[in-house]
């Protein structure tokens, strides 16, 4: 199912609610997650996404990790893996993960692609 959202400034975007399908990215993909989500779902995600290069950054659980040290950890991983403007950062989890990944994607090389994959239960 696709839900179209219209913002106050008349900009729109789609939210896709579905099971993840097998997807290949002709670019580098970095997944940002935490130990809780990765413990339940990371292997499933690895089965569904393939890319030129696929790597994972695991940040600690908790609101206290919503800080610049966490952003630095994500950005260092991006630099070490030589992500470019066509690369993709995937927020794999909710709250803190989405906020940190979105911010990191917005400032890395003036902005790179960012996906959010929210997880609500065990597979």
Residue ranges, per PLM feature:
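ATP/NTP phosphate-donor binding region
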Residues: 1-88
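Glycine/threonine-rich beta-strand-loop-alpha-helix active-site module
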Residues: 66-123
């Amino acid at each position: 199912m696709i839900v179209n959202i219209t913002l106050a400034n008349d900009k729109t975007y789609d939210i896709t609610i579905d099971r993840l399908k097998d997807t290949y990215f002709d670019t580098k993909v970095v997944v940002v997650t935490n130990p809780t989500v990765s413990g339940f779902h990371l292997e499933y995600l690895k089965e569904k996404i393939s890319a030129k290069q696929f790597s994972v950054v695991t940040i600690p659980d908790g609101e206290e990790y919503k800080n610049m040290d966490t952003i630095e950890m994500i950005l260092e991983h991006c630099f070490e893996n030589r992500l470019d403007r066509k690369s993709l950062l995937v927020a794999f989890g909710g709250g803190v993960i989405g906020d940190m990944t979105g911010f990191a994607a917005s400032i890395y090389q003036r902005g790179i692609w960012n996906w959010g994959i929210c997880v609500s239960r065990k597979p």
